[in-house]
Amino acid sequence: MSLLDRTLLEIFPQDSDSRDAAKARLDNLVMPHWALGDLMDLAIDLAGMQRTIKPLVDKRAIVTMAGDHGVAAEGVSKFPAEVTVQMVHAIIGGSAGVNALARSAGADVFVVDMGVNADLRDLVEQKKLINKKVGLGTGNIAKGPAMSRAMAVRAVEGGIDVAFALSTKYNIIGTGEMGIGNTTPSAAIAAVCTGKTVEEITGRGSGLNDAELQTKIDIIKKSIEINKPNSKDGLDILAKVGGFEIGGIAGLIIGCAAKKIPVVVDGYISTAGALIAAKIEPFVRDYLIFAHRSVEPGHVHMQEFLGCKRPLLDLNFRLGEGTGAAMAMNLVDGAKAILTDMSTFDEIAVTAPEK
């Protein structure tokens, strides 16, 4: 049995007893009923995920999956493909956006080479980079599949490996990514999974003008038409129109769900990874916390498909890397604090309101 198959056997829905116990406590906290709104709903989710009314979210990690894309050759990004490896060095050096925001959230940042088109063995040997490389960038989805099905499995299992390794030290993990051109495969994944049109799903990514946006839309339509991904098969979608880092994110989510670890999902590309994970195993949805809503127009459709009513933040983010996940972690900490640190009316002898 493969690592993926074994891991899927370990994924279960949230624990209903823990959810009920958390709700009973929250219903009686010293404040007007449900006065802290969505954070209280999140507190119930944390209890259900970790199977306790005293969840822990103090040991935090952001995992930035990196990979290159053959479709970048079609001009779907304002940035050249070599920026992927340059940004990998920046994140490892601690100077990127995700580093700044992760420090503010008390989170450690890990960078994973899923498929960067460069030899990064020196960074791996220095233990600055986690090596799960599947290939030197994907195929050009405008001309053929991104990867073979076997490579898709390797990408997902690479993410599972990372989740399992981090599960011994961390109790909450955020997703992130780096890969020039990766909003294009993400849009293709979103269109296939949600059934929305490519026009509804596709945005300007790194800042495309109107003509460039139309070219991007045409390329995504072409990639779906040529590759014909099976909308019911997550691995087929990943293989046909996905990316190595997107597969890594899917695997990270699957691995965290198996270990009962909450996953803070970052932006558009991370949510594409969540779509793949949910196609492979729908129960992973029970372990997702949606950090924010991206400027990318398709993000709302992707989140709604995954059952997200409203993400924690809506700040016009469109960077990725794990920046939104880092920003949201303090809100997750607040949700946990409401459940574990506030008193009930009975505990401090405060008169409860009339029912």
From Swiss-Prot:
The first-level EC class reads transferase
- Extract the InterPro entries matched here: Nict_dMeBzImd_PRibTrfase, Nict_dMeBzImd_PRibTrfase_bact, Nict_dMeBzImd_PRibTrfase_N, Nict_dMeBzImd_PRibTrfase_sf
A single GO molecular function term of this UniProt record: nicotinate-nucleotide-dimethylbenzimidazole phosphoribosyltransferase activity
Q: Where is the active site?
A: E321
- What does the entry give for GO biological process? cobalamin biosynthetic process
Known catalytic reactions: 5,6-dimethylbenzimidazole + nicotinate beta-D-ribonucleotide = alpha-ribazole 5'-phosphate + nicotinate + H(+)
- Keywords assigned by UniProt, alphabetized: Cobalamin biosynthesis, Glycosyltransferase, Transferase
Which SUPFAM superfamilies does UniProt cross-reference here? Nicotinate mononucleotide:5,6-dimethylbenzimidazole phosphoribosyltransferase (CobT) (SSF52733)
Q: Which Enzyme Commission number(s) are on file for it? A: 2.4.2.21
Q: In which pathway does it act?
A: Nucleoside biosynthesis; alpha-ribazole biosynthesis; alpha-ribazole from 5,6-dimethylbenzimidazole: step 1/2
Q: What does this protein do?
A: Catalyzes the synthesis of alpha-ribazole-5'-phosphate from nicotinate mononucleotide (NAMN) and 5,6-dimethylbenzimidazole (DMB).
Which protein family is named in the record? Belongs to the CobT family.
PANTHER family given in the database record = NICOTINATE-NUCLEOTIDE--DIMETHYLBENZIMIDAZOLE PHOSPHORIBOSYLTRANSFERASE (PTHR43463:SF1)
User: Mind telling me what this protein is named?
Assistant: Nicotinate-nucleotide--dimethylbenzimidazole phosphoribosyltransferase
Q: Which organism is it from?
A: Desulfotalea psychrophila (strain LSv54 / DSM 12343)
* Source taxonomy: Bacteria, Pseudomonadati, Thermodesulfobacteriota, Desulfobulbia, Desulfobulbales
Query: By which gene is this protein encoded?
Result: cobT
